[in-house]
From Swiss-Prot:
Span of the signal peptide: none
EC number: 2.4.-.-
GO cellular component, one term: Golgi membrane
Keyword line: Cell wall biogenesis/degradation, Glycoprotein, Glycosyltransferase, Golgi apparatus, Membrane, Signal-anchor, Transferase, Transmembrane, Transmembrane helix
Name listed for the protein in its UniProt record: Probable glucuronosyltransferase Os10g0205300
Naturally occurring in which organism (per UniProt): Oryza sativa subsp. japonica (Rice)
Membrane-spanning intervals of the chain: 12-32
Lumenal side: 33-351
Topology relative to the membrane: Single-pass type II membrane protein
Length: 351
Protein backbone atom coordinates (compact mmCIF):
# COMPACT_ATOMS: atom_id res chain seq x y z
CA UNK A 1 0.00 0.00 0.00
CA UNK A 2 1.54 3.30 -0.99
CA UNK A 3 2.40 5.95 1.66
CA UNK A 4 0.45 9.12 1.56
CA UNK A 5 2.29 12.00 -0.08
CA UNK A 6 3.98 14.63 2.25
CA UNK A 7 2.43 18.00 2.25
CA UNK A 8 4.56 20.67 0.59
CA UNK A 9 6.64 23.01 2.90
CA UNK A 10 5.44 26.51 3.26
CA UNK A 11 8.04 29.24 2.85
CA UNK A 12 8.94 31.29 5.96
CA UNK A 13 7.59 34.72 5.64
CA UNK A 14 9.71 37.80 6.31
CA UNK A 15 7.58 39.05 9.26
CA UNK A 16 8.12 35.75 11.10
CA UNK A 17 11.87 35.89 10.56
CA UNK A 18 12.10 39.43 11.88
CA UNK A 19 10.03 38.50 14.95
CA UNK A 20 12.38 35.64 15.87
CA UNK A 21 15.42 37.86 15.39
CA UNK A 22 14.02 40.55 17.69
CA UNK A 23 13.14 38.03 20.41
CA UNK A 24 16.69 36.61 20.37
CA UNK A 25 18.25 40.07 20.49
CA UNK A 26 16.10 41.17 23.44
CA UNK A 27 16.81 37.92 25.31
CA UNK A 28 20.53 38.54 25.01
CA UNK A 29 20.25 41.84 26.87
CA UNK A 30 19.05 40.24 30.14
CA UNK A 31 21.66 38.55 32.47
CA UNK A 32 20.79 34.95 33.31
CA UNK A 33 23.83 34.23 35.62
CA UNK A 34 23.62 33.87 39.41
CA UNK A 35 23.53 37.14 41.24
CA UNK A 36 26.40 36.09 43.57
CA UNK A 37 28.69 35.20 40.65
CA UNK A 38 30.87 38.13 39.62
CA UNK A 39 32.92 37.74 36.46
CA UNK A 40 35.67 40.28 35.77
CA UNK A 41 35.54 40.47 32.01
CA UNK A 42 37.56 43.69 31.84
CA UNK A 43 41.26 42.65 31.49
CA UNK A 44 43.94 45.33 32.02
CA UNK A 45 45.43 46.62 28.82
CA UNK A 46 49.25 46.74 28.42
CA UNK A 47 50.79 50.19 28.63
CA UNK A 48 51.50 51.80 25.30
CA UNK A 49 55.05 51.89 23.95
CA UNK A 50 55.20 55.63 24.36
CA UNK A 51 54.10 55.66 27.97
CA UNK A 52 55.60 58.37 30.14
CA UNK A 53 56.92 57.19 33.51
CA UNK A 54 56.65 59.69 36.28
CA UNK A 55 59.55 59.49 38.78
CA UNK A 56 59.78 61.02 42.15
CA UNK A 57 62.19 63.86 42.61
CA UNK A 58 65.49 62.73 44.20
CA UNK A 59 66.31 64.05 47.63
CA UNK A 60 68.12 67.33 47.60
CA UNK A 61 71.87 67.26 48.39
CA UNK A 62 73.62 70.19 49.98
CA UNK A 63 77.14 70.70 48.55
CA UNK A 64 79.65 72.80 50.42
CA UNK A 65 81.65 74.69 47.83
CA UNK A 66 84.44 75.51 50.28
CA UNK A 67 85.15 71.83 51.05
CA UNK A 68 87.92 70.48 48.75
CA UNK A 69 87.15 67.32 46.82
CA UNK A 70 89.21 64.21 47.68
CA UNK A 71 92.24 63.86 45.42
CA UNK A 72 92.45 60.88 43.13
CA UNK A 73 94.82 58.11 44.13
CA UNK A 74 98.29 58.69 42.72
CA UNK A 75 99.39 56.15 40.16
CA UNK A 76 102.19 53.84 41.14
CA UNK A 77 105.62 54.65 39.82
CA UNK A 78 107.21 52.30 37.34
CA UNK A 79 110.11 50.29 38.81
CA UNK A 80 112.98 49.84 36.35
CA UNK A 81 115.03 46.94 37.73
CA UNK A 82 118.39 46.53 35.93
CA UNK A 83 120.17 43.17 36.25
CA UNK A 84 123.46 42.34 34.50
CA UNK A 85 124.06 38.64 33.89
CA UNK A 86 126.55 36.32 32.23
CA UNK A 87 126.83 32.63 31.40
CA UNK A 88 128.07 30.62 34.38
CA UNK A 89 127.02 27.55 36.41
CA UNK A 90 124.58 29.34 38.77
CA UNK A 91 123.11 31.81 36.28
CA UNK A 92 119.77 30.03 35.93
CA UNK A 93 119.46 29.61 39.69
CA UNK A 94 120.14 33.29 40.40
CA UNK A 95 117.79 34.56 37.69
CA UNK A 96 114.93 32.29 38.78
CA UNK A 97 115.34 33.28 42.42
CA UNK A 98 115.26 36.98 41.55
CA UNK A 99 112.31 36.43 39.18
CA UNK A 100 110.27 34.84 41.99
CA UNK A 101 110.88 37.93 44.13
CA UNK A 102 110.00 40.39 41.36
CA UNK A 103 106.84 38.49 40.56
CA UNK A 104 105.57 39.15 44.09
CA UNK A 105 106.40 42.87 43.90
CA UNK A 106 103.51 45.25 43.12
CA UNK A 107 103.16 46.31 39.50
CA UNK A 108 104.09 48.16 37.36
CA UNK A 109 107.60 46.74 37.15
CA UNK A 110 109.93 46.32 34.17
CA UNK A 111 112.89 43.96 34.45
CA UNK A 112 115.84 44.93 32.22
CA UNK A 113 118.12 41.89 31.92
CA UNK A 114 121.40 42.67 30.14
CA UNK A 115 123.68 39.85 29.01
CA UNK A 116 127.39 40.21 28.45
CA UNK A 117 127.89 39.50 24.77
CA UNK A 118 125.18 38.19 22.48
CA UNK A 119 121.82 37.27 23.96
CA UNK A 120 121.60 33.51 24.51
CA UNK A 121 118.65 31.23 23.91
CA UNK A 122 118.88 29.72 27.38
CA UNK A 123 118.40 33.09 29.06
CA UNK A 124 115.61 34.05 26.65
CA UNK A 125 113.74 30.82 27.38
CA UNK A 126 114.10 31.37 31.12
CA UNK A 127 112.77 34.94 30.92
CA UNK A 128 109.76 33.91 28.85
CA UNK A 129 108.54 31.66 31.65
CA UNK A 130 109.38 33.91 34.61
CA UNK A 131 106.01 35.68 34.77
CA UNK A 132 107.57 39.17 34.93
CA UNK A 133 107.43 41.92 32.32
CA UNK A 134 110.98 42.10 30.97
CA UNK A 135 113.25 43.31 28.19
CA UNK A 136 116.21 41.19 27.14
CA UNK A 137 119.22 43.31 26.16
CA UNK A 138 122.82 42.53 25.24
CA UNK A 139 126.06 44.41 25.82
CA UNK A 140 129.40 44.07 23.97
CA UNK A 141 132.09 42.13 25.77
CA UNK A 142 135.05 44.34 26.82
CA UNK A 143 138.46 43.53 25.39
CA UNK A 144 140.83 41.51 27.53
CA UNK A 145 144.03 43.28 28.67
CA UNK A 146 146.17 41.11 26.38
CA UNK A 147 144.01 42.03 23.38
CA UNK A 148 144.48 45.80 23.75
CA UNK A 149 146.97 47.52 21.45
CA UNK A 150 150.29 48.37 23.05
CA UNK A 151 152.20 51.60 22.56
CA UNK A 152 155.90 52.09 22.91
CA UNK A 153 157.21 54.15 25.77
CA UNK A 154 154.00 53.81 27.85
CA UNK A 155 153.27 51.55 30.74
CA UNK A 156 150.33 49.20 30.36
CA UNK A 157 148.86 49.89 33.81
CA UNK A 158 145.32 50.67 32.70
CA UNK A 159 142.68 49.26 35.04
CA UNK A 160 140.61 46.31 33.97
CA UNK A 161 137.31 47.12 32.30
CA UNK A 162 134.24 46.19 34.36
CA UNK A 163 131.84 44.34 32.07
CA UNK A 164 128.91 44.85 34.48
CA UNK A 165 129.36 48.63 34.22
CA UNK A 166 128.93 48.39 30.46
CA UNK A 167 125.88 46.21 30.91
CA UNK A 168 124.27 48.74 33.25
CA UNK A 169 125.11 51.53 30.80
CA UNK A 170 123.32 49.58 28.07
CA UNK A 171 120.20 49.55 30.23
CA UNK A 172 120.58 53.28 30.96
CA UNK A 173 120.84 53.95 27.21
CA UNK A 174 117.61 52.02 26.69
CA UNK A 175 115.83 53.91 29.46
CA UNK A 176 116.95 57.31 28.22
CA UNK A 177 116.22 56.54 24.55
CA UNK A 178 112.64 55.41 25.26
CA UNK A 179 112.05 57.98 28.06
CA UNK A 180 110.93 55.38 30.58
CA UNK A 181 109.78 57.41 33.58
CA UNK A 182 110.20 55.61 36.89
CA UNK A 183 112.66 54.58 39.60
CA UNK A 184 115.90 52.95 38.40
CA UNK A 185 117.35 50.25 40.63
CA UNK A 186 120.46 48.11 40.00
CA UNK A 187 119.61 44.63 41.31
CA UNK A 188 122.45 42.16 40.91
CA UNK A 189 121.23 38.62 40.39
CA UNK A 190 123.33 37.04 43.15
CA UNK A 191 121.89 39.21 45.96
CA UNK A 192 118.98 38.44 48.26
CA UNK A 193 116.15 41.00 48.41
CA UNK A 194 113.30 41.58 50.81
CA UNK A 195 109.88 42.25 49.36
CA UNK A 196 109.62 45.40 51.52
CA UNK A 197 112.37 46.97 49.45
CA UNK A 198 110.22 47.17 46.33
CA UNK A 199 107.42 48.82 48.31
CA UNK A 200 109.77 51.51 49.64
CA UNK A 201 111.32 52.20 46.23
CA UNK A 202 108.16 53.97 45.08
CA UNK A 203 108.48 56.44 47.98
CA UNK A 204 111.69 57.84 46.46
CA UNK A 205 111.26 61.23 44.86
CA UNK A 206 114.75 61.94 43.53
CA UNK A 207 117.52 59.79 45.06
CA UNK A 208 117.18 57.25 47.86
CA UNK A 209 119.69 55.10 49.71
CA UNK A 210 119.66 52.47 52.48
CA UNK A 211 122.15 50.17 54.29
CA UNK A 212 123.16 46.82 52.78
CA UNK A 213 124.48 43.83 54.72
CA UNK A 214 127.39 41.93 53.15
CA UNK A 215 128.42 38.42 54.12
CA UNK A 216 132.05 38.01 53.12
CA UNK A 217 133.33 34.53 52.20
CA UNK A 218 135.04 32.69 55.03
CA UNK A 219 133.84 35.17 57.66
CA UNK A 220 131.16 34.75 60.27
CA UNK A 221 130.58 38.48 60.73
CA UNK A 222 128.24 40.63 58.68
CA UNK A 223 129.56 43.87 57.21
CA UNK A 224 127.12 46.78 57.17
CA UNK A 225 127.58 49.42 54.51
CA UNK A 226 125.31 52.36 53.86
CA UNK A 227 123.89 55.58 55.32
CA UNK A 228 123.25 56.60 58.92
CA UNK A 229 119.94 58.47 59.00
CA UNK A 230 117.91 60.73 61.24
CA UNK A 231 114.46 60.36 59.83
CA UNK A 232 114.92 60.63 56.07
CA UNK A 233 118.07 62.78 56.37
CA UNK A 234 121.49 61.20 55.80
CA UNK A 235 123.96 62.24 58.53
CA UNK A 236 126.78 59.69 58.13
CA UNK A 237 127.95 56.37 56.72
CA UNK A 238 128.49 52.80 57.90
CA UNK A 239 131.81 51.35 56.70
CA UNK A 240 134.43 48.91 57.98
CA UNK A 241 136.83 48.93 55.04
CA UNK A 242 139.56 51.42 55.94
CA UNK A 243 141.27 50.96 52.58
CA UNK A 244 138.32 52.70 50.90
CA UNK A 245 138.03 55.74 53.15
CA UNK A 246 138.78 57.95 50.16
CA UNK A 247 135.37 57.21 48.73
CA UNK A 248 132.93 60.11 48.83
CA UNK A 249 129.82 57.95 49.36
CA UNK A 250 130.01 54.54 51.08
CA UNK A 251 127.14 52.87 49.24
CA UNK A 252 126.76 49.41 47.72
CA UNK A 253 125.63 49.11 44.10
CA UNK A 254 122.32 47.61 45.25
CA UNK A 255 121.92 50.17 48.05
CA UNK A 256 120.50 53.13 46.13
CA UNK A 257 117.89 54.05 43.52
CA UNK A 258 117.07 57.24 41.62
CA UNK A 259 114.47 58.86 39.42
CA UNK A 260 115.05 58.09 35.74
CA UNK A 261 114.39 61.70 34.73
CA UNK A 262 117.87 62.54 36.03
CA UNK A 263 119.31 60.87 32.93
CA UNK A 264 117.88 63.42 30.49
CA UNK A 265 116.65 66.36 32.58
CA UNK A 266 119.49 68.35 34.15
CA UNK A 267 117.02 70.31 36.31
CA UNK A 268 116.29 67.20 38.37
CA UNK A 269 119.94 66.65 39.29
CA UNK A 270 121.72 67.97 42.32
CA UNK A 271 124.16 69.80 40.06
CA UNK A 272 124.55 70.28 36.32
CA UNK A 273 128.24 69.46 36.00
CA UNK A 274 127.54 66.26 34.06
CA UNK A 275 125.76 66.11 30.73
CA UNK A 276 126.00 62.34 30.28
CA UNK A 277 125.12 60.18 33.29
CA UNK A 278 126.77 56.77 32.96
CA UNK A 279 128.93 54.40 34.97
CA UNK A 280 132.69 54.51 34.48
CA UNK A 281 133.88 51.10 33.32
CA UNK A 282 137.51 51.95 34.17
CA UNK A 283 136.93 52.94 37.80
CA UNK A 284 138.91 51.13 40.48
CA UNK A 285 137.35 48.26 42.36
CA UNK A 286 135.19 49.63 45.17
CA UNK A 287 134.92 53.12 43.64
CA UNK A 288 132.35 52.28 40.94
CA UNK A 289 129.39 53.24 43.12
CA UNK A 290 130.67 56.56 44.43
CA UNK A 291 131.88 57.63 40.98
CA UNK A 292 128.39 57.13 39.60
CA UNK A 293 126.53 58.72 42.52
CA UNK A 294 128.68 61.85 42.29
CA UNK A 295 127.10 62.45 38.87
CA UNK A 296 123.58 62.34 40.33
CA UNK A 297 123.82 64.29 43.60
CA UNK A 298 126.13 66.92 45.00
CA UNK A 299 126.07 65.96 48.69
CA UNK A 300 124.01 64.18 51.34
CA UNK A 301 121.38 66.94 51.42
CA UNK A 302 120.05 65.67 48.09
CA UNK A 303 119.58 62.12 49.42
CA UNK A 304 116.62 60.42 51.08
CA UNK A 305 117.01 57.72 53.71
CA UNK A 306 114.84 54.68 52.93
CA UNK A 307 112.95 53.80 55.07
CA UNK A 308 112.92 56.73 57.52
CA UNK A 309 115.67 56.13 60.03
CA UNK A 310 117.35 53.51 57.79
CA UNK A 311 116.44 50.94 60.43
CA UNK A 312 115.84 47.97 58.10
CA UNK A 313 118.17 45.66 56.20
CA UNK A 314 116.21 45.03 53.02
CA UNK A 315 118.83 43.24 50.92
CA UNK A 316 121.94 41.15 51.47
CA UNK A 317 125.06 40.97 49.34
CA UNK A 318 126.38 37.40 49.31
CA UNK A 319 129.58 35.84 47.96
CA UNK A 320 128.70 32.19 47.54
CA UNK A 321 129.88 31.38 44.03
CA UNK A 322 133.01 29.39 43.21
CA UNK A 323 135.06 31.26 40.62
CA UNK A 324 136.79 28.05 39.48
CA UNK A 325 133.58 26.23 38.56
CA UNK A 326 133.37 24.91 34.99
CA UNK A 327 130.35 25.94 32.95
CA UNK A 328 129.24 23.75 30.04
CA UNK A 329 127.66 25.76 27.26
CA UNK A 330 124.06 24.65 26.90
CA UNK A 331 124.58 22.11 29.71
CA UNK A 332 125.72 19.55 27.13
CA UNK A 333 128.95 17.58 26.78
CA UNK A 334 130.29 15.02 24.34
CA UNK A 335 133.33 13.92 26.35
CA UNK A 336 133.83 11.21 28.98
CA UNK A 337 130.69 9.37 27.97
CA UNK A 338 132.30 5.90 27.71
CA UNK A 339 131.46 3.15 30.16
CA UNK A 340 134.20 2.95 32.78
CA UNK A 341 132.97 0.06 34.94
CA UNK A 342 130.64 -2.33 33.10
CA UNK A 343 128.04 -4.27 35.05
CA UNK A 344 128.70 -7.98 35.57
CA UNK A 345 126.16 -10.27 34.01
CA UNK A 346 125.13 -12.85 36.59
CA UNK A 347 123.37 -16.06 35.66
CA UNK A 348 119.77 -15.95 36.75
CA UNK A 349 118.17 -19.16 38.05
CA UNK A 350 115.44 -20.62 35.94
CA UNK A 351 112.03 -20.51 37.51
Amino acid sequence: MAAPPCPPRRPISAPCFLLCFLLGFVAGLFPFAHRHLHLDLHLPLPPPATAILVREDPPSVVVDVDTPLPAAAEERKLLLVVTPTRARPLQAYYLRRLAHTLRLAPSPLLWLVVESGAATRDTAALLRGCGVMYRHLSSPVPDAPQDRPRRRGRRQDRPAVDSRARQRNTALDHIEHHRLHGIVYFADEDNVYSLDLFYHLRDIRSFGTWPVATLAPGKSKTILQGPVCEGSRVVGWHTTDRSKNQRRFHVDMSGFAFNSSKLWDAKNRGHQAWNYIRQLDTAKEGFQETAFIEQLVEDETHMEGVPPGCSKIMNFHLHLEDKNAIYLNGWQTTQNLDVIIPLKKEARPLL
